[in-house]
Every structure is written in C-alpha cells, then in structure tokens.
Amino acid sequence: LSSTISSDLSGAPFGNVVSYSDGVPGESHGIPYFYLTTLDPTARDALEDERTSFTLSEFPLGTCGKVDPENPTCAKLTLTGKLKVVDHKSPEAALAKAALFSKHPEMEGWPKNHHFEIFKLEIENIFLIDWFGGPKPISPSQYLDYGRDQGSVMFL
C-alpha cells in the first residue's frame, strides 16, 4: 500500500495498492521501485508532493501461519520517504526496469500512450511492527545493509 498526500483531495492522505519490486530474483536490495502513470493518483500526487509511505505485510509470504494478518506478531513494515521519478536514461532505470519486469512481466505490455515512468522510494524512516511492544528502531542504512547482505524479503 502506497500512501501519498493527495493533490486531488485537498491534501488528504490517499492509499493505493501498487505493484513494486526491489530487485531481480536473488538480487533484491530493499529500495522499492514502481512503474506508474499520471493517470493514477499515486504518480500525480508524488509529482506535486514527494512525501510517501509504503507499507508491506509479512502475511503474503505465508510465514504468519494461521495468525490474523493484523495481529502484531505478523510483521508489518512501513517505509517513509520521497517518491521520485528515476531518470529513464540512467543505469538505475535499467536496473529498476529489469527488477519490475522480472516480477511483473505483464508491465512490458502496458499501454505506451499511458506514459508509464519508473519511480523509486528514497527511504528516510522505517516503522517495523513484528511483535507486541511498539515499533522496532531500524535506520535506513541498517535496513539497506541487511537487504544487501541477505537479499531483501520485500521481493519474495
């Protein structure tokens, strides 16, 4: 779930389920990339105000067992930061496109006249709930270093 400051709703928060990837299989790095069009509010909002949060749940991985997905023991990760367009001529754009299209192959066939662009979340803060007792303190560098060493679970 990506949440932005809505330009269409007078600055109200707006949450939207969006496809993402943080690397090609086996080479995840933790930085989420998105393939968005300004026909969608998420891209429009980010171009007006880059502040964004992106929330993931452990539940789709199947590791929560039969626990209610909203139970604190089923981890939830929220990344906050700036959602920015990736320069389409940069090496990062090629990496992001490979990551997105390997996870979501149908993206390659999306309508060209919708002018999809690659965005990335520049992570500034991390909020992790994986048990009772409040969020766990994790810095962006700890998160990204762990993702580089272990392969991020975001891609799974």
Question: What residue spans do the PLM features occupy?
Answer:
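Conserved hydrophobic/aromatic beta-strand scaffold that supports enzyme active sites
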Residues: 1, 15-19, 76-80, 118-120
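An N-terminal domain-cap segment
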Residues: 1-47
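Short, structured beta-strand-loop surface elements
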Residues: 10-12, 39-103, 116
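Short glycine-enriched loop/turn motifs at secondary-structure junctions
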Residues: 27-30, 77, 112
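Short hydrophobic-aromatic micro-motifs
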Residues: 32-36, 79, 119-121, 127-128
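C-terminal edge-of-domain segments
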Residues: 92-156
